[in-house]
């Protein structure tokens, strides 16, 4: 690993920790391709380049270090921000993307296959400016950067909150916090106090924010980017529809047609995954707790079952829920020989991976493992239960990430430039900005929008140029 310091003795930038800086040229070439596929993000970069609304922003970023994220990072920098970045998943980094960002002089701490100890070390590093200052904004995916400051601040007052880890992830998180508390007492509360706000990318991270706010523990305002329509209805559905199959195919080379595929959860992500499997002619079954989502699945022609029913009958299992222990040890013991098990929700605890540690693991290739049970039956676990589309492939296509990252950029501008507008709480981007992102994305698709006449706008009671739907409208 390349060890990070602010500058080496020759004055060369080296404030990064990545796999291989020599991959930078490759990463830059892929970024050039991605640029043409990210019209919304590029249009926002062009619109705000002259005014640089993020001048003075210091953004601590925790989001998958991919080629598309590299385009987001450079957009934030072009708009005036200083940025330090880490990946929000130990397997999701594209090493050539990280190298391209490091070569551009932007601090980045990420490589594919980090240990959990390194993961939390890198998350700490995004908060450490070399002039001794702190960030004033967070851009988060899954909520780990936000969690770190909140849990660390709590531990400063009551060390018992990090005394009893319940899983391997918490063991390393708690250990990293204890280390920081010993080295720099008061660091967490000082750092949290400087944060103007956080913008959150995912369903899982948004749930964390709402939970903290309901308990009165949220320390700074947050914008829920995930539930912007041009994020959740596009990234979550259409992104997963393409990247799930990409991950499974790269990992296993399995023929999907004719297989029984179980999609655990039928939210936006589950809907996209079910469409993907159906498109390749799998028999798609869905598990759901919510009767409304279950009814939607049934009306789309999917069979709605329970995991207990499906465990010994299906060939491919995909968790999409954001919940814990959706696929349990007992479910996996019941599965067929060579059943494929994977997750496309944010954390690895949707599958009870910890219970599999008692068995023999045979690594087939990176992020593909055979779990060998005592009766010699094997199941194929992808990405150790972490995000299959990023662990075994390269994540969502650039075009759909343009929409998501356009929202992230606008949310960062909104929070940073209007601090008095947002007391502590969780907010949505205005509908006008949601529609703006959609307009920008449409330009490269050859789409022609119909325009309301004055008479039509008056008749349905909406502004002629939008927004066209109420806040509670369900697209």
From Swiss-Prot:
It is found in: Cytoplasm. It is an enzyme of class 3 (hydrolase). Substrate binds at residues 66, 141, 201, 231, 235. It holds the Pfam family AdoHcyase. Pathway: Amino-acid biosynthesis; L-homocysteine biosynthesis; L-homocysteine from S-adenosyl-L-homocysteine: step 1/1. One of its GO terms (molecular function) is adenosylhomocysteinase activity. One of its GO terms (cellular component) is cytosol. Its cofactor is NAD(+). PROSITE patterns: ADOHCYASE_1, ADOHCYASE_2. Disulfide bonds: none annotated. The gene is ahcY. Its main location: cytoplasm. Belongs to the adenosylhomocysteinase family. Keywords: Cytoplasm, Hydrolase, NAD, One-carbon metabolism. InterPro entries: Adenosylhomocyst_ase-like_sf, Adenosylhomocysteinase-like, Ado_hCys_hydrolase_NAD-bd, NAD(P)-bd_dom_sf, S-Ado-L-homoCys_hydrolase_CS. May play a key role in the regulation of the intracellular concentration of adenosylhomocysteine. Its EC number is 3.13.2.1. It comes from the Bacteria. Binds 1 NAD(+) per subunit. GO terms for biological process: L-homocysteine biosynthetic process; one-carbon metabolic process; S-adenosylmethionine cycle. This is Adenosylhomocysteinase. NAD(+) binds at residues 202-204, 236, 265-270, 288, 323, 344-346, 389. It catalyses: S-adenosyl-L-homocysteine + H2O = L-homocysteine + adenosine. It comes from Geobacter sulfurreducens (strain ATCC 51573 / DSM 12127 / PCA).
């Amino acid at each position: 690993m390349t060890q990070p310091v602010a500058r080496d003795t020759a004055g060369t930038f080296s404030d990064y920790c990545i796999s291989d800086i020599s991959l930078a040229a490759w990463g830059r070439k892929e970024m050039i391709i991605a640029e043409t596929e990210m019209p919304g993000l590029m249009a926002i970069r062009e619109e705000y380049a002259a005014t640089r609304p993020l001048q003075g922003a210091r953004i601590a970023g925790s989001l998958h270090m991919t080629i598309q994220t590299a385009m987001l990072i450079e957009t934030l920098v072009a708009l005036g921000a200083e940025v330090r970045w880490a990946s929000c998943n130990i397997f999701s980094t594209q090493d050539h993307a990280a190298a391209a960002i490091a070569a551009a002089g932007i601090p980045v701490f990420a490589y594919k296959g980090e240990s959990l100890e390194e993961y939390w070390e890198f998350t700490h590093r995004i908060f450490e400016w070399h002039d001794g200052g702190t960030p004033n904004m967070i851009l988060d995916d899954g909520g780990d950067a936000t969690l770190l400051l909140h849990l660390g601040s709590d531990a400063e007052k009551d060390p018992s909150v990090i005394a009893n880890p319940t899983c391997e992830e918490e063991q390393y998180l708690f250990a990293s916090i204890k280390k920081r508390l010993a080295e720099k007492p008061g660091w967490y509360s000082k750092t949290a106090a400087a944060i103007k706000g956080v913008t959150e990318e995912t369903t899982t991270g948004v749930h964390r924010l709402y939970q903290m706010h309901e308990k009165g523990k949220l320390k700074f305002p947050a914008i829920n980017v995930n539930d912007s329509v041009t994020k959740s209805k596009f990234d979550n559905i259409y992104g997963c529809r393409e990247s799930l199959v990409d991950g499974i195919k790269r990992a296993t080379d399995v023929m999907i047609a004719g297989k029984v595929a179980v999609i655990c959860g039928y939210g936006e992500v589950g809907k996209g995954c079910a469409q993907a499997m159906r498109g390749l002619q799998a028999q798609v079954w869905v598990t759901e707790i919510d009767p409304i989502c279950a009814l939607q699945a049934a009306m789309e022609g999917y069979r709605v079952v329970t995991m207990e029913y499906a465990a010994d009958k299906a060939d491919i299992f995909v968790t999409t829920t954001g919940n814990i222990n959706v696929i349990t040890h007992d479910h996996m013991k019941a599965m067929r020989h060579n059943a494929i098990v994977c997750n496309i929700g944010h954390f690895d605890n949707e599958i009870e991976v910890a219970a599999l540690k008692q068995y023999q693991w045979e690594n087939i290739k990176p992020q593909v493992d055979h779990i060998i049970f005592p009766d010699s039956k094997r199941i194929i676990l992808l990405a150790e239960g972490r995000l299959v589309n990023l662990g075994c492939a390269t994540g969502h296509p650039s075009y759909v990430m343009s929409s998501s990252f356009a929202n992230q950029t606008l949310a960062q501008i909104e929070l940073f430039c209007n601090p008095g507008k947002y007391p502590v709480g969780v907010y949505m981007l205005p509908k006008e900005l949601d529609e703006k992102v959609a307009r920008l994305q449409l330009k490269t698709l050859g789409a022609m929008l119909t325009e309301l006449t004055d008479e039509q706008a008056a008749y349905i009671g909406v502004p002629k140029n939008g927004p066209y739907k109420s806040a509670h409208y369900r697209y």
